Amino acid sequence: MVLIRVLANLLILQLSYAQKSSELVIGGDECNINEHRSLVVLFNSSGALCGGTLINQEWVLTAAHCDMPNMQIYLGVHSASVPNDDEQARDPEEKYFCLSSNNDTEWDKDIMLIRLNRSVRNSKHIAPLSLPSSPPSVGSVCRIMGWGAITSPNETYPDVPYCANIKLLRYSLCRVYQRMPAQSRILCAGILQGGKGICKGDSGGPLICNGQFQGIVHGGGKTCAQPYEPGLYIKVFDYTDWIQNIIAGNTTATCPP
C-alpha cells in the first residue's frame, strides 16, 4: 500500500522533481502483465523516479544518474492503483559505480549496480533477467519498457508500465543526431521517423533485444520520440566482467576503459 500511495502522488505531481536525463516510453502500449517480471521501480518520496532490471535474486542494474537519496525499490508492480499480491519492496544495501560514473561527461559509464538488503523471491510477476551472452546486432528489434511519460513535452504519466518496439541503429547515427562523442560502449536505438521512444521516468530501465538484456536507458532528446533523435543506452555486454566480479565479491574491480 505504501508503494500505491507514493506512485499515485508521483503521478499527480507529474514528476516535478524528475531527474535530469530521466526518460519515458512514448508511442507504446500497456505492457503485458507477465512481460516485465524483471522490471523494477526506483523512487523516493521527493518524486524521483527510475527503472531498473533485476539480474538475480540480490542485484539490480540501473543507470548511475538514477542514484537518489532514500531510494526505495519495488518489484512485481504492474498498476499504481491495483496492487499485485506478490509485490516486494527492498532497500539498497550497497551501490557500486564505475570510476567517474557520476560525471556527466562519462557518457559510457552511466551504470550502477545495487545489492538489495534482502533476496527477492521469484513469483508469477517477478523473475530476474540474465546478462547478455553476446553483443547485439544493428537492425535488431528491441523492446523498451518503463513508467515514464507517455506524452511530451507536456508530460502525462501512466498508471501502468508501457512497452514499445524500436530498432538498434548504428552508433554513428547517434553521433550525428545527438552530437555524442565517439564512444564504443553506447548503443543507439529508436525509430528515425519518430513516434516511439524513451522519455522522462524511464531512465535506468532495460533495452531487451531478441530476448537478451542489452542496454540501460541513458537518455534521448529534450522532446521525446522526435524524428532523428534516437535514444542512448549503456551497452551492458561491455560491463559483464565488471558486474560479475562485483557480484562475486571483488568490489575493487574496475570498469572497462
Swiss-Prot record:
Disulfide bonds join C31-C163, C50-C66, C98-C255, C142-C209, C174-C188, C199-C224. The active site is at H65 (charge relay system), D110 (charge relay system), S203 (charge relay system). GO terms for molecular function: serine-type endopeptidase activity; toxin activity. Glycans are attached at N44, N103, N117, N154, N250. Its EC number is 3.4.21.-. It comes from the Eukaryota. Residues 19-24 form a propeptide. It is an enzyme of class 3 (hydrolase). It holds the Pfam family Trypsin. Residues 25-248 form the Peptidase S1 domain. It is found in: Secreted. Residues 1-18 form the signal peptide. Keywords: Disulfide bond, Glycoprotein, Hemostasis impairing toxin, Hydrolase, Protease, Secreted, Serine protease, Signal, Toxin, Zymogen. GO terms for cellular component: extracellular region; secretory granule. The keyword rRNA processing does not apply. One of its GO terms (biological process) is proteolysis. Expressed by the venom gland. Monomer. Snake venom serine protease that may act in the hemostasis system of the prey. Belongs to the peptidase S1 family. Snake venom subfamily. PANTHER family: KALLIKREIN-1, KALLIKREIN-RELATED. This is Snake venom serine protease 3.
